Amino acid sequence: MEQIFSKLKFITHGEGFIDITYDLNLCVEKNNFDSGILNLTSLHTSCSLTINENADPNVLRDLKKYMQSIVPYDSYLTLSKNREEISYKHYQEGADDMPAHIKTSLTNTCLSCLLYTSDAADE
């Protein structure tokens, strides 16, 4: 079994989603993959990976709004009976940094995807 390592870099502009499908497809083509497992890892501590559909832009809009509602920027309400508001202590890297760390903890920093061509699936 052959293993190939490739490193991809993406420029980001703060909170949001980046569709990396095209870049992953180029990497697969460049390395002549036809079947195997594609392991993806984010090396950044406030970035994560998700797999979602790309047909309806409302999916990403809804995901962003939901994440903003459960992980607000400045403070959060405790889940206790009295719903105390707590401010984040970690803010040295910007107001969006602590919420980004929390969102990363709630999602994935690694994904594995089955990769095969229609020819490989027929074997």
Predicted segments with their positions:
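Helix-adjacent hinge/juxtasegments
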Residues: T50-N52, D56-Y91
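Conserved small/polar residues in nucleotide/adenosyl-binding loops
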Residues: Y116-A121
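Mid-chain, well-packed structural core segment of small domains
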Residues: D74-L115
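Preference for bulky hydrophobic residues occupying beta-strand positions
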Residues: L8-F10, L40, L49, T104, ...
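Active-site beta-strand/loop microenvironment that shapes enzyme catalytic pockets
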Residues: G16-L63
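Short amphipathic
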Residues: E2-T12
